[in-house]
Each structure stands twice: as C-alpha cells, then as structure tokens.
C-alpha cells in the first residue's frame, strides 16, 4: 500500500487535529466587556493603565534596593518599585560644572543677532576698503616718477605716509580675513567668534575707516605736492594741499557726529524698551491687585 494512504498515519493526523481544536480558545468582545464590568464591581478601584515601556530601561533591582533590606515584604516592594521605575522614562540628569558641553550651544537672540550682523558687516566693509586703498597707495608709490630736483624731505614724508597707510590697511585686512570665515562657518550661534573677538573687530573697523582714510587724505596731499613740484610749479601743490585741510576737518566732524547720533539712538531705543517694560509690569501689578482685593474683602 502507498505511504500516502497509510491508515495509521491518517488516524494520527486526525487525533492531532482534534487535540488542537480542543486547546483553541475563542474570546469575544462581549467576554472582555463582561470581565471588565465584573472587575469594576468587585474591586471598586479606578482603572489604571498599564505603564508602557519608555526610554532608558533599568533592571528591576535598581529601584531602591538598598532600602528595607531586612524583610521579605521590603524586598518585594523594592522589586516592584524597581520594575515600575524601569518602565518609566528617567529624568535627565542635571549637568555638573565638570561636564563639558560638546554640543551645539543654540542660536542667538534678537539683540545678539544684531551684534552678529553688525560685526559681519564691519568685517566685510573693512576688508574691501583696506584692499582697495592699500593697492592704490602701492600703485602711486611705484608709478610716480621722481627727479633729482625733488625735495629729499618730501620723498621721506611720502615714503613714511605710504608705509603707514599700507601697514594700517594690511592689518585691518588681515584681521577681517582671519575672523570673517569662522563667523560665516559657525553662523548666527553662540559658537561664533565675534563674541570673544569683539575687540579685534572694532580695531579692524577703526584702522580701515578712521585712521586709514585720514592717512589716505594725507597721501593724496603729498602726491599732489610731489607731482607739481616735479614739473616746476609748486604753487599748484600748495593750493591742492590746502584744499585737503577743510576736507579732513569735515571728515573728522562727520565721523564724530555719526558716532554720536548712533550712540544716542541706541540709548534712546534702550530707554524706550525699559519704559515699555515698566508700563507692562505696572499693568500686571494693577491686575493682580484688582483680582486680590475682592477675595480679601470677602474673607474679612
């Protein structure tokens, strides 16, 4: 007889199927509702949801195992507490002073963002202005033609002024070139170097826009005098150099007025913010008094 029609094997499969059918349990929704209703009537306690496992699981023995060591109930309670604590999310541990914050320190607020944008704009303006004026001074020094009749003290003055002009602008260009890439790389965050290098940013701005421009005016006057003296007409050199004196005075005056107006505007804005904050606090205090007064009268 073929193996597929073996009566003993067929009988064995039937017995196994009947056994599985006997062990199968069927639970309906009505059975669950009935069990819950029965539990409510018997216990009378509110239904507490089972704690779901969260992050950072701990072993059951970690929940206060050092307490109640002497008794069995204490051990059971500790095990239960440890299990419950292992299913809850742990609170983040507070950072101590010894911990090093290696993460990103976040973005700046509005006032600090204004300082960041201002420092970035100052560095960009300093780099452009310094590169332009330093190159112009070097070209003038090289392209000027000098004769034997040119005054030697005048050549010394020209060399000194040109050296100072190029040195000041190169210093400003160096500082702006070194700081600006790191500011653009870090972005408007607390990791930006403008917070600690504010002195160098202001120094670069001072060299490029104040000292550098004044030296550039002096350089133009000396070049005029050298050029017109070389052609035998020093009177034109005197006139053009004299015209630069009121220009320099106006330059210094405008620089002072712009700086003064900027400072006064900043102080005025700060005063307005303080006054607005005081008004807000006064209104809030009056609201609190108005809400507290009726309750006090009722209590009396």
Curated annotation (Swiss-Prot):
Residues 147-153, 227-237 are extracellular. Residues 62-75 have a biased composition (Gly residues). It is found in: Membrane. It is a multi-pass membrane protein. It holds the Pfam family Orai-1. Residues 1-128, 175-205, 259-300 are cytoplasmic. The chain crosses the membrane at residues 129-146, 154-174, 206-226, 238-258. GO terms for biological process: store-operated calcium entry. Keywords: Membrane, Transmembrane, Transmembrane helix. GO terms for cellular component: membrane. It comes from the Eukaryota. InterPro entries: CRAC_channel, Orai_sf. Gene3D superfamilies: Calcium release-activated calcium channel protein Orai (1.20.140.140). Coiled coil: none annotated. GO terms for molecular function: store-operated calcium channel activity. Its main location: membrane. PANTHER family: CALCIUM RELEASE-ACTIVATED CALCIUM CHANNEL PROTEIN 1. Belongs to the Orai family. Ca(2+) release-activated Ca(2+)-like (CRAC-like) channel subunit which mediates Ca(2+) influx and increase in Ca(2+)-selective current by synergy with the Ca(2+) sensor, stim-1. Required for Ca(2+) and IP3-dependent contractile activity of sheath cells and the spermatheca. Affects brood size and somatic cell function. This is Protein orai. It comes from Caenorhabditis briggsae. The lineage of its organism: Eukaryota, Metazoa, Ecdysozoa, Nematoda, Chromadorea.
């Amino acid at each position: 007889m073929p193996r597929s029609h073996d009566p003993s094997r067929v009988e064995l499969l039937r017995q196994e199927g009947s056994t599985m059918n006997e062990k199968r349990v069927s639970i309906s929704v009505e059975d669950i509702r009935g069990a819950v209703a029965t539990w409510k009537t018997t216990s009378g306690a509110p239904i507490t949801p089972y704690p779901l496992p969260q992050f950072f699981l701990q072993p059951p023995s970690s929940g206060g195992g050092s307490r109640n060591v002497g008794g069995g109930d204490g051990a059971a309670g500790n095990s239960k507490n440890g299990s419950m604590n292992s299913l809850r999310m742990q609170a983040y541990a507070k950072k101590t002073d010894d911990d090093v914050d290696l993460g990103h320190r976040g973005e700046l607020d509005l006032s600090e963002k204004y300082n960041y944008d201002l420092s970035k704009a100052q560095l960009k303006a300093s780099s452009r202005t310094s590169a332009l004026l330093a190159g112009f001074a070097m070209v003038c020094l090289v392209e000027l033609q000098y004769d034997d009749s040119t005054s030697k003290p005048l050549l010394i003055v020209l060399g000194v002024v040109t050296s100072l002009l190029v040195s000041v602008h190169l210093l400003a260009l160096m500082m702006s070139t070194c700081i600006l890439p790191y500011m653009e790389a870090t972005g408007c965050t607390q990791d930006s170097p403008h917070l600690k290098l504010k002195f160098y940013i202001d120094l670069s701005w001072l060299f490029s826009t104040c000292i550098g421009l004044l030296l550039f005016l002096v350089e133009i006057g000396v070049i005029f005098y050298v050029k017109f003296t070389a052609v035998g007409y020093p009177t034109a050199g005197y006139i053009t150099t004299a015209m630069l004196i009121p220009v320099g005075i106006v330059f210094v005056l405008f620089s002072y007025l712009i700086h003064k107006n900027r400072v006064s505007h900043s102080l005025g804005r700060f005063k307005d913010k303080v006054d607005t904050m005081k008004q807000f606090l006064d209104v809030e205090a009056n609201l609190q008094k108005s809400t507290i007064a009726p309750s006090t009268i009722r209590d009396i």
